């Protein structure tokens, strides 16, 4: 009996220490953790992608504008080869009528997609499950898997980084106290880049990238998601048309649509000098404009809004009000070019972070 109790105590301590020492990206982890705070079967739309998505689209403001519930299941630098795992994880708790997929994650090279840091941002932020194990096994060679199964092997030396441990626990505590993540998945920088560089490294699609897109679209077709919309968020430099055509041809085989919103600046009323904080990310002004445009598009094309309980509707109204207040403060700070980073778990009564 004493041995059993001792084993249990050791197991609890092991799990607690493993949890405390994990350090990937605080922002990315909170974007993912916030998803699990949403009531089951309460999301009409789930959006997948990387930082462009949660910098440029606000789920609470979309609810206020178009009446459907949604969540950015995203983290910075999310590679397209993980989108299947992200959708699989989503469908455990939600049955969205529509999945929206931002395509930037498909443009990473095969080497970049398989980087340990990108994989760990995802698998170290989700609960232990068959999906987590399968994702590790699909992306890591057998000889290298053990530190992914027992992540204390990776993070054991982090006990010295007390400042980051404290910031991470504070962020988790903030979201937990809110009940749900009030701004859902969100990040911005309070600036407007009036001198955006004219050139960024060109986006290219190779055979590997097309295969990843095709595999994901095929997986979507076999899933329980009713429909999928592939999009490209507005960027300051457009894709070459041949890559738009390659994406369209790939996803249309499965009955899905692709829309490149780089081509809708006039309709959205976006200006590069006012609505972006860097060439690839909208600021809060651009976020508000694009959220209204995309949510109208989704409402008109897919009509995803479902029936929800009065309690859930009340909470979404609270989220929209909280987000409006936060955006008002962020817009003022953006006009002043404060240049700080903010997240859904930030204390908006104080200045944001100097770095991401």
Model-inferred region functions:
Residues 2-23:
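Hydrophobic membrane-insertion alpha-helices, especially the h-region
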Residues 74, 232, 260-262:
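Residue-level recognition of beta-strand->loop/alpha-helix junctions
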Residues 42-44, 67-69, 95-98, 221-228, ...:
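Loop/turn elements at helix/coil->beta-strand transitions in domains of secreted/extracellular proteins
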């Amino acid at each position: 009996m004493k041995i059993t109790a001792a084993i249990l105590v050791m197991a609890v301590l092991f799990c607690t220490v493993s949890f405390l020492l994990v350090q990937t990206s605080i922002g990315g982890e909170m974007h993912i953790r916030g998803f699990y705070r949403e009531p089951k079967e309460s999301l009409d739309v789930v959006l997948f992608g990387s930082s462009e998505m949660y910098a440029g689209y606000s789920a609470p403001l979309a609810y206020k504008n178009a009446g459907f519930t949604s969540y950015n299941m995203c983290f910075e630098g999310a590679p397209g080869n993980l989108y299947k795992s992200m959708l699989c994880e989503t469908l455990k708790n939600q049955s969205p009528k529509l999945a929206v997929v931002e395509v930037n994650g498909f443009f990473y090279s095969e080497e970049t997609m398989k980087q340990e840091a990108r994989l760990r941002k995802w698998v170290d932020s989700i609960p232990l499950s068959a999906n987590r194990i399968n994702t590790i096994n699909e992306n890591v060679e057998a000889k290298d898997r053990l530190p992914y199964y027992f992540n204390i092997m990776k993070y054991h030396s982090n006990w010295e980084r007390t400042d980051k441990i404290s910031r991470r626990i504070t962020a988790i505590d903030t979201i937990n106290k809110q009940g749900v993540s009030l701004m859902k998945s969100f990040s911005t920088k309070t600036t407007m880049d009036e001198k955006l560089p004219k050139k960024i490294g060109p986006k290219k699609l190779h055979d590997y990238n097309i295969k990843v897109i095709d595999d994901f679209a095929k997986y979507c077709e076999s899933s329980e998601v009713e429909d999928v919309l592939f999009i490209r968020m507005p960027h300051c430099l457009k894709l070459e048309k041949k890559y738009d055509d390659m994406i369209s041809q790939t996803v249309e085989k499965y009955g899905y649509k692709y829309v490149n919103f780089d081509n809708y600046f006039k309709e959205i009323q976006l200006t590069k000098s006012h609505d972006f904080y860097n060439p690839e990310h909208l600021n809060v002004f651009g976020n508000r404009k694009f959220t209204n445009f995309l949510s109208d598009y989704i409402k008109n094309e897919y009509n995803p809004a479902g029936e929800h309980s009065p309690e859930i509707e009340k909470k979404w109204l609270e989220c929209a009000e909280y987000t409006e207040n936060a955006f008002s403060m962020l817009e003022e700070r953006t006009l002043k070019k404060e240049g700080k980073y903010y997240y859904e778990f930030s204390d908006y009564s104080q200045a944001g972070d100097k770095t991401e």
